[in-house]
Amino acid sequence: MREPVILCVSANPGMDRRLRMKSLVVGSINRASSAEGFAGGKAAHVAMAAHALLAKSVWIAFLGGPIGEECVTQMESLGVRVVSMPSSAPTRVNLEIIDDSGQITEILEPGGAPAASEAQEFLQRCRREIENAGESGLLAISGRLPSGVGADLYVSLIEAARANGLPSFIDSSGEALRLSVEAKPQFVKVNRQEAEDLIGKAVQTTPEAVSAAQEIIRRGAARVAITLGSEGLIWVEANDGPVWKAKPPQLQVVSAVGSGDATLAGFARAATLGITGEDAIRLAAACGAANCSAIAPGRIELATVKSLLPQIEVQRL
């Protein structure tokens, strides 16, 4: 059997620029004590985390300019295969500012608009990668779409995956998420805010999160996970399937940026290994927790994940 491959699609990647400083003062000059740059964007985080879990991961991304080239270099150095699709728009930079108190401020640049011909070529290349992956593969679509790209791009990819026997996992927001859910993906992963925006109701408690997941299932998804920050996550399956909640232990957090993406990587890896139920959500939660102490978003370590597995509290609701 062909080794399963996890295709991580990134239509709007970026460079994660992490700045550390004593404190951030708005309206004043702020000097950083250190600065680091990491290949980023949600799908990049998924690809790196999946690779750490010994999965064969492929990162398919719009990339432009010197920053895009640096992202390719970094991802390839980690062992991730990169399918770089040229974009006339320079790859964006996302700032993550960490002060001495541990407070994190994120400033995310908008993604530049690729040309219409570039968007079409991106879609066609994704379809070829889906066809080449075979039925043992998995499609993971993460992040927002760049300006100028139709909200139905992800729908086309979900349909291509279905036609080739691949399950599709989606983590997005806004109109792209709404349309993707209606396209009936196998799995949807959203955070609390994204769930609230999608269904138009509050998602503050566990019962509300379960209700939101069930509503997303009614709209088309087969399985839904909603991440709830330090409270963990819930996972609901269609057809009156089991409802699970997982909660990680209290941790020393460096940064939670990318933890939802690492969680998605855990679910994706579980799917390619045939792991289901309690063991799947335990692995996903351990990946999300491991990301909190990682050197950069998505760069989890397998040893850390393994050490966290027995510490994850899993409950069937």
Locations of regions flagged by a protein language model:
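Glycine-rich phosphate/adenosyl-contacting loop at the front of the ribokinase-like
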Residues: 1-60, 69-70, 252, 317
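Conserved phosphate/ATP/ADP-binding segment of small-molecule kinases
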Residues: 152-243
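Conserved phosphate-binding/catalytic region of the ribokinase-like
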Residues: 178, 206-317
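Glycine-rich beta-alpha junction loops
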Residues: 11-15, 63-64, 89, 194, ...
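Conserved N-terminal subdomain of the carbohydrate kinase-like
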Residues: 52-137, 307-317
